[in-house]
Amino acid sequence: EKKREEKPKKKRLRIQGAAWRRLDNTAKLFAAVSGEDLSSVFRISAVLKEKVDPELLQRALVRTLPEFENFRVKLRKGFFWYYFETNTRNPCVEEEQRAPCRFIGPHRGARFPFRVSYYGCRINFEVFHGLTDGLGSLRFASRLTEHYLELVKKLPVMVQGREF
């Protein structure tokens, strides 16, 4: 009787640059319970001294996103679970026109699970809580604001006390 050689089990590599990735347990919960009535979206804003230039804010957003590759995703609904899929598009800055913290659903095509908007002198960063927590969103919003101010002032800007 021939003995079968057992093949060693291959470990599944978790590559950050993969086309999709699983949500952590908290993100699974937020994705499952979120909807129009319970958005699970929160906002961080930066208030400036001058009116926001939308074109420069768009350039700052495109410049910021490569520093936060985990944010370059879209939320998708699979057969059994939600997951993040790599999003190759660039997000678009929009003028704030509706109520803040609106639902960001997985059924909206190529949308990102965050939104960057402006109103007057204010830059808004709204994010689905399944993507990041307050600290991650604060880092993103701070870096976005830094890039924006660098483009406006045409010189490097360092946020004071950036230990968060």
Where are these regions (language model features)?
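Non-catalytic N-terminal regions of enzymes
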Residues: E1-F164
